[in-house]
Amino acid sequence: MSSSGVTGSEQLNRLSCKRCKERKVRCNRVMPQCGRCKPNDLECVYPVRVKRRSARPLIDPALSADGSNAALSTILDRLQRLEAQTVAGSSSTNGQSIPTPSGDGSEVSSSPVAFSTTGHESSALTPHSSDRAMDAMTVLKDAVDQVQELRKRSFGSTAITSSIDIPTDLAKTWVANYFQHMPACMFLGLLDRRIIDLIPDIINLPHIHVDPVILVIYYSIMYHGCSLKASNVTSTSSLGYMNSSYLGCLRAVPSWEREASGTMTDLIAALFTSRVAAEFFDYDLAWRMFKQACEYCQTLNLHKLDSDENNTFFSEAKCDNERRGFWEVIQIDLFYRLILNTPPVITNDIWKVNLPWLDPDSDPLPQGMQTIAFLASSRVSLVIARFFAMLDDPENTTKPEIVAKTEDLCREMQQIFTEWQLMEWLEGAQDNEQDIWVVADVILTGYTSIIYMFRKMALLNSTSPRPPTTDLDIPDSPIVEDAARRLIAALNRLLVIYPYGVTMTALFGAYRCFVAFAYLANTILRAEDPRSYMADIKALERLSDQSTLLCRGNRDVMPLVKAMQSINEEIRKKLEKQTPRG
């Protein structure tokens, strides 16, 4: 219905007035009086839209809107206890210095750009302007769509029939490097490593049958193992072997799914496949595999590790690894829900799992960056859980109120990185691949989550129960700008430590880092004087140039690389216009 004729003092309501609705006549929905009530001098009453209360438990009932204060405080207290143990033990740790929380978090960050969000009001949140020649977000989103399409073609029916030729000696090296240099995968410790060590020697032998679930895990390990710096292969060779490993994984998945019964091995295979698929930009497969993993968690009663029901097959004193694995599954569930707009899975049902290392019979708290990264990532996940609980709370009805609470949560997440000095640690990291990857995961997950939490703000005015969401909807905010800036800095640092094209594509796939690149580029393109963003311009150019160099020969990701180049060219053109010639 046309809204022409509506005066400046009138506004369009989304509901029909009660009188028109009772008489079953069309209402033009103009407030404060509709077109039918006004000429008859009748009282015009509009119904008040009540925010729908979710019928499902949001997370564990402990994290629901009604009980969030006490329960979250309890969990945070437990995290602080673990952090205190970590700080107490870190003083005796040798080697590279391990960061410790700064207490009040007041220490000034020494990263390239300090936090610039203090003192900004919620009114600073503004939508993107659409009156510019180039929208970097649109350009990069289209490029990512092209990458997804090219990769689907690459692994289509033709590729499925091609052979997988991985030399046995290299396969053994990559398996060994994976277990030595990659962070401990969720629940992988429950699988007998000797099985994986034997696979390279027997996989091509006649009359030898390897279970499909073991093949899925084996090829996933090969995928990660051949990309490690310790494997000492060139970027081009690594790309070919990674593609072969992914192909082997895809081939084994259908047979495995037909045989899967919900064992721990099935759970490990599903989590591995979900991770690898996300790095290959196949988010549909990643999401499907993760849903299966959550089903297996429930089949194994991992969501009841600390409930009163003693029907799990884990001993009470020995399930810290399972607790940690389950918490990592929760973190993935929240992250997928945020960036892929998926419904909650494992967090949709009741679960009761304590943090690891709190039981009196537990082993001593491990020291080092692995533990610190887990504690930091757990706090990040709690912030995201509180964010979703806040969105579903019917008491939060106004957009300014929700925006203000979201900004507070994002600043709290920033404080986590400041306290643990994770960016500073990454800047000084050298060759410890295990620690580097777990710290990078926390940094990339946390700052990406900040950006996507603000993306949700653009949907608050929508009346659709499932509004369409895109990466183009991220409003302007100094908090988001800071998060994007730090993400670009982390990417540049990681590509220095691991100068491989597969590193770049895996990070852009798993963490959708193109959103940070596009947001920062749009900020520069909209600025009146881009010269005030010279440090950011150089950081974007550095990332684009390094990606171009590393991805030579990788046809699938060229649309993404060329899109970054074109955006930087546009920034340079604007910069030249603003620079006086003398």
Residue ranges and their predicted role:
Residues T7, G240-I268, Q292-D308, E328, ...:
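Long, amphipathic alpha-helical regulatory blocks in the mid-to-C-terminal portion
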Residues P32-G35, K51, I196, L267, ...:
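Short amphipathic alpha-helical segments embedded in low-complexity Lys/Glu-rich regions
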Residues K152-T265, L271-D282, E309-A317, D361-G368, ...:
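C-terminal transcriptional activation/regulatory domains of eukaryotic transcription factors
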Residues G368, L375-L391:
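Extended catalytic-interface subdomain
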Residues A84, M134, N177-Q180, R275-V353, ...:
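Acidic/serine-rich, low-complexity amphipathic helices located in mid- to C-terminal regulatory regions
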Residues M1-M186, P200-M222, T236-S237:
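Intrinsic, low-complexity transcriptional activation domains
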Residues M186-L191, K229-T234, N301-K304, R337-D349, ...:
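Proline-centered turn/helix-capping motifs that create local helix->coil transitions or kinks
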